[in-house]
Amino acid sequence: MFKIKKLLQKAIENLKKKNIPQPELEAQIIMANVLNCDRIHLLIDLDKEINKNQKNKFEKYVNLRMKNYPLFYIIGKKEFMGIEFIISPDVFIPRQETEFLVEEVIRLNKNRNSRILDIGTGCGNIAVSIAKFIPGADITGIDISKKSIEIARLNSKRQNVCDRVKFICDDFLRFKKNLNINKRFDFIVSNPPYVAGSEFKFLQREIFYEPRIALYAGEDGLFFYREIADFSKKYLKRNGLTIVELSYNNSEKVIDIFRNMDLRFIKTVKDYFGFERVAV
């Protein structure tokens, strides 16, 4: 048998050597996941012993993290808007800054029965969160990845909103060509891929483990904003709103794209660091 305290100490030392941020916290999160308990219960009884299988599993996960493999892929879940979402390496990991987008939809929604489209839904974190906070909304999430759609459907079932959230596996470019012109939306929302080709070499190492299809957006990083603007011009209801997440440095270019489609720019929302993170 092996004491939790000693295993954690060793893991923290190893994570520190690899410059992993918050090594103590991350080691505790990994151990809690292995033992299927929360961190509070873990910390109450650090002298508890675990078996060899649990020890091996813990050390395997710590070794993965030392290679910059994302923590949330290791534990298979990520909290977003206070909701726990199941994730896998097949989906983009939900980011805290995307909560600004969801909060803006909730704040601006005036119609209890709004029709909302989430483009590039991933694990469904945006669509499912909106459904939880706007009970009457009719939401469609679209993604090109079959595995993403499977996980999104699982998350909608876990949150009991699958009757109001429909997920479609399709290429957005094909979807926008074939959609009935009468099926317009009150909100079109998206956290689209926005990494430019020239920016890839500057990304944090752990981001390379995430699906490239969820990151890459052409050489200038603006491909999907152009497509979303074109789609919005045709499929937004009168007084409808398109709300998109921004990169830290692309707000002016994105705003120009929508203005060039004769769509009125309303505002941007800044994130915790003062970057313009959401455009309405």
Each PLM stretch: what is its role?
Residues 194-224:
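Mobile active-site "lid"/loop adjacent to the S-adenosyl-L-methionine
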Residues 84, 138, 164-166, 264-267:
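Conserved beta-strand segments of alpha/beta enzyme cores
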